[in-house]
Amino acid sequence: MAEKRNIFLVGPMGAGKSTIGRQLAQQLNMEFFDSDQEIERRTGADVGWVFDVEGEDGFRDREEKVINELTEKQGIVLATGGGSVKSRETRNRLSARGVVVYLETTIEKQLARTQRDKKRPLLQVEAPPREVLEALARERNPLYEEIADVTIRTDEQSAKVVANQIINMLESS
């Protein structure tokens, strides 16, 4: 990878976007951003609180603005929120401003990785988590696929292995 292209990670919650993103940025000596963490930094509140107070629409508006600003940077790795792809504007910006890597995982892995995480507002509901994740997958997976330049399944692999796969795919493209 001679020039530093932006790398944008998309996929469902629990796919490993933040963990893999940090690993990838470290290996490539690039700056790492996480859109949820950036929203928390700017608001001084966690994403669950923003979700509760502003609702999903308010949160998505903030997310779209943050992703727009971050994708204007050069040479970054960005882990996006799982629902960021719901915005057509965000999908267009991600596609136009960098390489989009879809980190794919199974519902079982998502359940295992998110079961103790209280910072997942969409899982803090009455419905069983499996049903919530299945509904989100039906809605969002086609959107991830629509903009993905590369798709990698993360289920049984370490962040370092996935980061190396991404680097190898980018170098050969």
Curated annotation (Swiss-Prot):
Query: Could you tell me which pathway this protein works in?
Result: Metabolic intermediate biosynthesis; chorismate biosynthesis; chorismate from D-erythrose 4-phosphate and phosphoenolpyruvate: step 5/7
Q: Name one GO biological process term.
A: amino acid biosynthetic process
Chief location category: cytoplasm
- An example Gene Ontology CC term for this record: cytosol
Q: Does the keyword Cytoplasm apply?
A: yes
Cite the record's note on assembly. Answer: Monomer.
Q: What is this protein called?
A: Shikimate kinase 1
Please give the organism.
Answer: Sodalis glossinidius (strain morsitans)
